[in-house]
Amino acid sequence: MISIILVMIGGGFGAITRSAITDYFNHKFTSKLPIATLIVNLVGSFLIGLNIGLSISISWFPAFFVTGFLGGLTTFSTLAKELTLMMTPKFNINLFLNYSLLQFIIGFIACYIGYHI
């Protein structure tokens, strides 16, 4: 029961953080790419790699931080929505492929770097 509460609290903080980052970047920058989603996913990938690399052994930490906070921070569903919305009558294959590659390849690299720090 405690782990469920930790996931809920961590997820709430992660979602609030994602919302704040999204609002900030949407107001500060104009781009054809959804920069905010890219940033939260890259930060989340780096942090999960860091968590794996540090082998944090605090019993409550994975539920709160990994499943909760990082689960609330990162977002695959928003990525899927953004990629779908790119497939409009003005579809730009280069934009679509670049954004996809940035998300997945750079996300993996961020996780790898976090793991090896």
Curated annotation (Swiss-Prot):
Q: Which InterPro entries match?
A: FluC
Is Transport one of the keywords UniProt gives this record? yes
Residues bound to Na(+): G71, T74
Q: Where are the transmembrane segments?
A: 1-21, 46-66, 95-115
Modes of activity regulation? Na(+) is not transported, but it plays an essential structural role and its presence is essential for fluoride channel function.
Give the principal location in a single coarse category. Answer: membrane
The GO terms describing molecular function are: fluoride channel activity; metal ion binding
Residues folding into a coiled coil are none
- What is the annotated localization of this protein? Cell membrane
Query: Per UniProt, what is the membrane topology?
Result: Multi-pass membrane protein
Pfam families to which the protein is assigned, alphabetical: CRCB
Where on the tree of life does the source sit, at the highest rank?
A: Bacteria
**GO CC field:** plasma membrane
Does Transmembrane helix show up as a keyword for this record? yes
* Catalysed reactions listed for this entry: fluoride(in) = fluoride(out)
**Which keywords does the record carry?**
Cell membrane, Ion channel, Ion transport, Membrane, Metal-binding, Sodium, Transmembrane, Transmembrane helix, Transport
Q: Name one GO biological process term.
A: cellular detoxification of fluoride
Q: Which family does it belong to?
A: Belongs to the fluoride channel Fluc/FEX (TC 1.A.43) family.
Summarizing the function annotation, the protein's role is:
Fluoride-specific ion channel. Important for reducing fluoride concentration in the cell, thus reducing its toxicity.
HAMAP family named in the record: FluC
Q: What is this protein called?
A: Fluoride-specific ion channel FluC 2
Gene transcribed to yield this protein: fluC2
